[in-house]
Amino acid sequence: MKYARVRTHGGVSIISAFIDGMGGAFSIDVPMTVTVREGTCSEEKKISEDIRRYLSIATCFRFTVDSRIPSGYGLKSSSAYILALAKAMAVYSGIDISDMEIMTASADISKNSGLSMTGALDDLCQAMYGGYCLTDNRKMKILRRGRLPEMPVLVCADGDKRSSGKVSIEGHFTNAIRRVEDLAFKGRIFDAAVANGLIYGSIFGMDLRLIGSMLKAGALYSSQSGKGPAIFGIFADRRSAMNARSDIGFGIVTKINNQGIRYWKYDS
């Protein structure tokens, strides 16, 4: 049976774009795989119908999702999901479409469907290319991207889930977030991610206990991933990350990911 399969990854916030539209994220090795097959239009899910209409695809689809990304915790599951689904549908249909076109389609559909307030080009970019991406989400431009050392990462997703579709921020945080942007564009990606998490943690709340446990176990960097509530820690070695997980009692030990999106098409 003919089908297409796409694998991408979740990520961690470097700069959350809710304040001024500037965004950034880096990829972690927590995969999501989406498989699409031809389906019946009467049973098609709305998200695949929206993508199909946007890309002018006639075929109706059914699909399955196999994901290790905790959803609703600030680890980029929505962007990975919509990008992988759109890419799989394009691959299945044999559409010649550029990376930027598929990311633009995914961003527009994310905003229209309420999955994202900004379109999250930064999150889509890290899911497309791996490594890190810095973007202008309002102008839909990738400003910088590159590889990172594949250091061990512990992510702990706990607490109430938080939607990215509707985010309300009261107060004047522009100056603070621009200092984060300065760090990121100077190449201090992890410092920026920490500072960004602290800013958004001050707005939405964060689990300082988890951050403290990671730092106590030897994390080089630890903070909240954007608006959270997931907490991340970056470690010099896997043993330290495993020890932190043991002390905390839960979490995913993984690593920074530099592998971009992968896809396969089967006609058997």
Curated annotation (Swiss-Prot):
Chemical reaction(s) catalysed: shikimate + ATP = 3-phosphoshikimate + ADP + H(+)
SUPFAM superfamilies listed in its UniProt record: Ribosomal protein S5 domain 2-like (SSF54211)
Entry's Gene Ontology BP terms: amino acid biosynthetic process; aromatic amino acid family biosynthetic process; chorismate biosynthetic process
Listed InterPro entries: GHMP_kinase_C_dom (IPR013750), GHMP_kinase_N_dom (IPR006204), Ribosomal_Su5_D2-typ_SF (IPR020568), Ribsml_uS5_D2-typ_fold_subgr (IPR014721), SK_arc (IPR010189)
Residues annotated for ATP binding in this entry: P70, S71, G72, Y73, G74, L75, K76, S77, S78, S79, A80
Pathway noted in the entry: Metabolic intermediate biosynthesis; chorismate biosynthesis; chorismate from D-erythrose 4-phosphate and phosphoenolpyruvate: step 5/7
Keyword terms of this UniProt record: Amino-acid biosynthesis, Aromatic amino acid biosynthesis, ATP-binding, Cytoplasm, Kinase, Nucleotide-binding, Transferase
Protein's UniProt keywords contain Transferase: yes
Entry similarity comment: Belongs to the GHMP kinase family. Archaeal shikimate kinase subfamily.
Entry protein name: Shikimate kinase
Organism in which the protein naturally occurs: Thermoplasma acidophilum (strain ATCC 25905 / DSM 1728 / JCM 9062 / NBRC 15155 / AMRC-C165)
Gene name for this UniProt entry: aroK
